[in-house]
Amino acid sequence: MIRFLIPTAKEMKPSKEVPSQKLSEKSEAILTEMAKLSTDDLSIAYKIKPEQAEKEKQRWDAILAGEAKNYPAVELFNGLMYRHIKRKDLSTCEKDFLSHQVFITSSFYGIIPAFYPIQEHRHDFHTKVKVNGQSLKNYWRAEYDQFLEESQVPVVSLLSSEFEDVFSPSLRKQLFTVSFMEDRNGILKTHSTISKKARGAFLTAVMEESCQTIDALRDLSFDDFYYRKDLSSDSELFFVRKVKKV
């Protein structure tokens, strides 16, 4: 068996409502700090326009009041990566895979299972807020480290450095990483759009093929991406897609 870590997303799209889950003490402490912030404070913390900050203020107030609706995390997040993850018409095996092998790294909830019930909110490790005098990365480090320390199976990171940096450097080395590139006339290139789409497509391929070992991941091909042994190492997997000349 393998576990996969994926990031959260700013873009959200409410789906079918589910029962709520009591917030952990660590999340409650973050909620307390976020609820103290005014619309202007949120505008600065998020680096967004005042009208957008007003929407976020309403969301935090609703969570604080216990009035916010809850949705499965993997269905609520709707960023580019998530839109490329198969989330509808899942077979029993595919849903079981998402339920037990895919975990989402959140700066508000911690590391949660894919279908964990969450509320609409905007929060990531770039959010300028301190909890108990700590940055969000330091605040969550012990719990993130514990996830890796207690994992009895390989953990594959589909995270950006923003999320990987939460783990202690010594434990971060335990992660298997996956990178995606395009071959344009012999020149290898990558950028965030390629990576986000490919992460979702990769996870879908893993789910559909029921890959349960790192070697099985190396055998995958999807969306014209193929494993490149010459670029890869024992813990780093590179997949490249050739782009035809226009």
Curated annotation (Swiss-Prot):
Biological process (GO), any one: response to hydroperoxide
Annotated Gene Ontology cellular component terms: cytosol
Similarity field: Belongs to the UPF0246 family.
InterPro entries (alphabetical): YaaA
Organism: Streptococcus thermophilus (strain CNRZ 1066)
HAMAP family with a match to the protein in the record: UPF0246
Superkingdom, taxonomy of origin: Bacteria
Protein name (database record): UPF0246 protein str1967
Signal peptide start-end: none
Pfam family, one: H2O2_YaaD
